[in-house]
Amino acid sequence: MTLASQIATQLLDIKAVYLKPEDPFTWASGIKSPIYTDNRVTLSYPKTRDLIENGFVETIRAHFPEVEVIAGTATAGIPHGAIIADKMTLPFAYIRSKPKDHGAGNQIEGRVLKGQKMVIIEDLISTGGSVLDAAAAASREGADVLGVVAIFTYELPKASQNFKEAGIKLITLSNYTELIAVAKLQGYITNDGLHLLKKFKEDQVNWQQ
């Protein structure tokens, strides 16, 4: 079993991911979605957490061997990033969504040196907007952002477009395609549900029609 399928299995088992193609969720954006993900839940399950953190470390070593600092996005990327940095004996920092409105007004907490090679940790990629904002903030502070590594992606076309336009490499430990395949195999969804889930990936607006 691949790492992607192992993580997909764990996310379903611990109910970090819910699939309701016949009774969709409403995202904050207003989009009706057949999937809801809360990867913060993974922190409460040592087996799942260990699988994810080891997966992060292996992936970073394989794709970004020159990394010098790990950064987590606030707030979801902070705990994972801190664990990864500890496992890799690397410095850690975290990136706020916007600068503080008091004190030193920092957006990056921790010490990042000019030119330091950074990998940013995120838990979930939908359109990628927030983590790309974090990457831009890190670059403005002088970091050399090598890429983003995340637990899971919905594989939305908008995300691919956003990362391409930003020139930022994205790698995820698991993904939507892998998850719905595992969900079908393990009986979480029906054939009709799988069909709807596949339609959502291609068209987030008209998938129910």
Curated annotation (Swiss-Prot):
Cofactor(s) of this protein: Mg(2+)
Domain of life: Bacteria
Keywords on record: Glycosyltransferase, Magnesium, Pyrimidine biosynthesis, Transferase
Residues holding 5-phospho-alpha-D-ribose 1-diphosphate: 96, 100, 102, 122-130
BP GO terms, sorted: 'de novo' UMP biosynthetic process; pyrimidine nucleobase biosynthetic process
UniProt pathway: Pyrimidine metabolism; UMP biosynthesis via de novo pathway; UMP from orotate: step 1/2
Residues annotated for orotate binding in this entry: 126
Example GO molecular function: orotate phosphoribosyltransferase activity
EC number from the UniProt entry: 2.4.2.10
Keyword Transferase: yes
UniProt xrefs under PROSITE patterns: PUR_PYR_PR_TRANSFER
Pfam families listed in its UniProt record: Pribosyltran (PF00156)
Residues spanning the membrane: none
Role: Catalyzes the transfer of a ribosyl phosphate group from 5-phosphoribose 1-diphosphate to orotate, leading to the formation of orotidine monophosphate (OMP).
Family: Belongs to the purine/pyrimidine phosphoribosyltransferase family. PyrE subfamily.
PANTHER family per UniProt: OROTATE PHOSPHORIBOSYLTRANSFERASE (PTHR19278), URIDINE 5'-MONOPHOSPHATE SYNTHASE (PTHR19278:SF9)
The protein's assembly and partners: Homodimer.
Designated name of the protein: Orotate phosphoribosyltransferase
Lineage: Bacteria, Bacillati, Bacillota, Bacilli, Lactobacillales
Gene name of this polypeptide: pyrE
